[in-house]
Amino acid sequence: MPSRTVRYARYSPRQRRRRMLADRSVRFPNDVLFLDHIRQGDLEQVGRFIRARKVSLDTIHPSGLAALHEAVLSGNLECVKLLVKYGADIHQRDETGWTPLHIACSDGYPDIARYLISLGADRDAANDDGDLPSDLIDPDFKDLVELFKGTSMD
């Protein structure tokens, strides 16, 4: 009977280091990666996550915001449009009752506000503090002031 020789895999120091690093790699949850892609405006990755059903657009994340709120907060109209195309709710409220329209008005994004209104966003939706989107507009945001002309603004 032939003798069997046990062969042990030998690793060079470089291979051992690579293997150790691979064992220590960090894996972030899909929702964390998804929100990061939204903040960076990486539409290709945002679309991939949605199409692969790796995330839910309705989830309120630990930040207190849903994906659409994050996109509005980043000021990226194209990302907002992409999320809406895939079913994001333009009426969804964050944990303090803010809608995406509240954020667009507060942060001075007239194009996003106009887009949301064109889809039927509620101009009269009050947040938990009783503020309407128009109450949050800085008077220096002339385009937004004009957009809400005729509604109550202090």
From Swiss-Prot:
<dbReference type="InterPro" id="IPR053080">
    <property type="entry name" value="PP1_regulatory_subunit_27"/>
</dbReference>
<keyword id="KW-0650">Protein phosphatase inhibitor</keyword>
<dbReference type="GO" id="GO:0004864">
    <property type="term" value="F:protein phosphatase inhibitor activity"/>
</dbReference>
<keyword id="KW-0677">Repeat</keyword>
<dbReference type="Pfam" id="PF12796">
    <property type="entry name" value="Ank_2"/>
</dbReference>
<feature type="repeat" description="ANK 1">
    <location>
        <begin position="63"/>
        <end position="92"/>
    </location>
</feature>
<dbReference type="GO" id="GO:0019902">
    <property type="term" value="F:phosphatase binding"/>
</dbReference>
<protein>
    <recommendedName>
        <fullName>Protein phosphatase 1 regulatory subunit 27</fullName>
    </recommendedName>
</protein>
<dbReference type="InterPro" id="IPR036770">
    <property type="entry name" value="Ankyrin_rpt-contain_sf"/>
</dbReference>
<keyword id="KW-0040">ANK repeat</keyword>
<comment type="subunit">
    <text>Interacts with DYSF and PPP1CA.</text>
</comment>
<feature type="repeat" description="ANK 2">
    <location>
        <begin position="96"/>
        <end position="125"/>
    </location>
</feature>
<dbReference type="InterPro" id="IPR002110">
    <property type="entry name" value="Ankyrin_rpt"/>
</dbReference>
<comment type="function">
    <text>Inhibits phosphatase activity of protein phosphatase 1 (PP1) complexes.</text>
</comment>
